Each structure stands twice: as C-alpha cells, then as structure tokens.
A protein has these predicted regions:
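Core subunits and conserved enzymes of cellular information-processing
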Residues: 2-285
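Peripheral (non-transmembrane) domains and long loops of multi-pass membrane proteins
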Residues: 2-42, 270-361
C-alpha cells in the first residue's frame, strides 16, 4: 500500500513539474514571438490587446523602472532636462503653478509627434508607447501619494549615508543609480516594441529610415535637447532670479553621464540593427537549404560542404548574415527540420551591401 502511495506521489510530483515546465516553455515562446516572429500578423487597434498582452505587461514594468529612476533618483540630482521633457520644464519655470501638471504637459507635447510619425512607424510601437506614457503617469501619481512620498524622501537619501555636499557626492550617486534603473527600463520597453515617448518617436523614425543604431540616434537627439535646455534655461535663470539658480558644472556633467548610461543600456538590451553571422551545422543541410528557398528566406545564405579533420567525415554547414533579434526565430524554424543541429554566432562589424530589414522594421 505504501509503495502504491509513494508511486502515486512521485507521479503527481513529476506531473506537476512537467506542467510547470510546459507552462514556462509556452510563456517563453509567447514572449519571444512578441519580440520577433516570422509569422506575426499586422497589429491593429482591434487585435492589439490579444497580440501584445505580454508586451503590455512588460511596458508596465518598464515604465515603473523608468519612473523610479527618473522620479526618485534623477530628480534629486537636478540634472538638465533632456528630450521633450525640456519643454514642460520651461513652462513650469515661467508659470510655477503648472508644476503639478508636468505629466499632462509632457503628454500634450507628445501628441504632435504621434500624429507626425504615425504613418511611418509600426502601429504597435505607437500603441505601446502611448500606453507606456500612461503607465508612467500612473506610477508618478502613486509616488506622489503623501505617505509614499514621505517614505521615499526619508529612506532614499544620501544624507543618511554620508556627510558630503549635495552638489558633489549626491549628484553623482543619484545620477549613476537613476541612470542604471531608468536605462534598464528604457531598454526593456524598446525590446518589447514600445518606448518612454518624447523624442523616441523621432528616434524610431530616423533609425528605421537610415538603419542606424537606436541607442546612437537617441543619444544624439537627447544631447541636442540637453544643449537647448542648458542654453535657454540658463539664460532665463541668469536674467530672472525667480527661476532659480543657474545649472552647476556638475549638474551638466551629470546630465551627460545619465545619457551615456541610458543609451548604453538601450544598445545592450535592444541592438536592433546589430548584424551577426549565423552558422548552422547539421546533417540535413540540403533539406534546410531547400526549406529556406521555398519559404523565400529574406537574407542571403550559403551551403558549404567539407571534410572534418576530427572524424574524417563530410561536414555540412549553412551560413547567413542576420540581425541579432532575428536569431531565435530562425533557429526555431531550423529545429523543425533538424532538432539536434548546433550553431554558432559571431558579430559582423561591417558589410558591403545593405541587409533586408523588412522583418524588423
């Protein structure tokens, strides 16, 4: 009887583990398919919630990280506002009573960008970015709740850790921590098809048109707005003391550090146009080669045959240059023909011809 019970318990444990494993696999597959899929359908307003449910959830997380980094840390460092955020800051300086409407003003300045770029970028990008901005407003409201705000101010303060002047140690610390947290949130948002809004609409359009790194384009645009902010706001503060003290050198340096950190994270998490050499080693190379031709594979590829120096047997491999974010989806297709193939990837620094970007743009 005991043996039967033990057998039953072991079976139940195995069954539960198997169910958990299958669930994890399904979730992982669904998430990867939302990031990039060869068979994805065009996203419309009607099917958006159904096709992008995981992306919506990730945008909630990404907006939380971004808001924590900016609202709690970067705000304490008092760095120069960058991007579209510089415009509501100017309004706040001129009319201090509008400070509490900063988030709404930021949304308002995004509307023209949404209208202008809507025709030229993926609809899912617009939907997810707008949703991400709404989530940012939601988290900002949460952090502004009196009890939470007091707890944050009392807990996250370097004055409790080190007796250093605010314009040195604290600015550096808040900038570094805020840059890392918000940078991860920004990268995560881009990876799942959205962004934090503002100049990201312009970044996405220019990056897609000229096939340039999103991180680099984001840095260039943000730096441009930062310089604009430094010049205009500094002049306003210089001629009218009611607008506050001019920016310090450390605040300006902190701004550039923040932008370097966030764009570094963005490039690392979402290297959209990063090219890789994918080499597939298999005993079914000709079948895979035929499958790629029949399915109208969009990149160039080559079939190589040789003799292994180790086994002295014929070796077959397929080489193709792909974009980094396409790799998982391509390997899934190859696995349908040869489940036990193996592969290697290596970075491509430059190519003589432009690679087809139709699947990722």
């Amino acid at each position: 009887m005991k043996e039967e019970m033990n057998t039953s318990q072991n079976y139940n444990k195995t069954s539960l583990k198997e169910k958990i494993r299958k669930l994890k696999t399904k979730i992982s597959t669904d998430i990867n398919n939302e990031i990039f899929s060869l068979n994805s359908k065009p996203v419309t307003f009607k099917n958006f919630l159904r096709q992008k449910r995981w992306s919506i959830f990730i945008m909630l997380i990404a907006s939380f990280l971004f808001t924590v980094g900016v609202h709690i840390f970067i705000q304490k460092a008092k760095v120069v506002p960058t991007g579209i955020a510089a415009l509501p800051v100017l309004i706040n300086l001129i009319w201090p009573s509008t400070v509490k409407f900063f988030s709404l003003l930021y949304l308002a300045f995004n509307i023209p960008l949404i209208i202008i770029t809507y025709k030229y970028v993926r609809k899912s990008f617009v939907f997810l970015t707008v949703l991400g901005m709404l989530f940012q407003n939601l988290w900002t409201l949460v952090f502004e709740i009196d009890v939470i705000k007091k707890w944050i101010d009392a807990t996250i303060s370097l004055r409790n850790l080190a007796n250093k002047p605010q314009d040195t140690w604290e600015i550096i610390f808040y900038t570094l921590v805020g840059g890392i947290i918000s940078g991860y949130g920004i990268g995560l948002g881009w990876k799942f098809g959205g962004s934090t809004g503002g100049t990201d609409f312009i970044t996405n359009y220019i990056s897609g048109k000229y096939k340039k790194s999103i991180g680099k384009m984001s840095f260039i645009l943000s730096i441009s707005f930062a310089v604009f902010s430094i010049v205009i706001i500094s002049l306003m503060k210089h001629y009218n003391s009611n607008y506050g003290d001019p920016f310090t050198f450390l605040q300006i340096i902190g701004t550039f550090i923040y932008l370097l950190i966030t764009t570094t994270f963005l490039n690392k998490i979402y290297p959209k146009y990063k090219k890789m050499m994918l080499t597939i080693y298999t005993t079914h190379a000709e079948k895979i080669f035929k499958y790629l031709k029949e399915t109208k594979y969009w990149h160039s590829f080559h079939l190589w045959k040789g003799i292994s120096g180790y086994t002295q047997k014929e070796v077959q491999k397929i080489e193709t240059i792909v974009f980094y974010i396409e790799i998982k989806a391509i390997l899934q297709e190859v696995a349908k023909i040869d489940p036990i193939f193996w592969f290697s990837i290596s970075p491509i620094l430059t190519t003589s011809t432009r690679i087809d970007t139709s699947k990722i743009d």
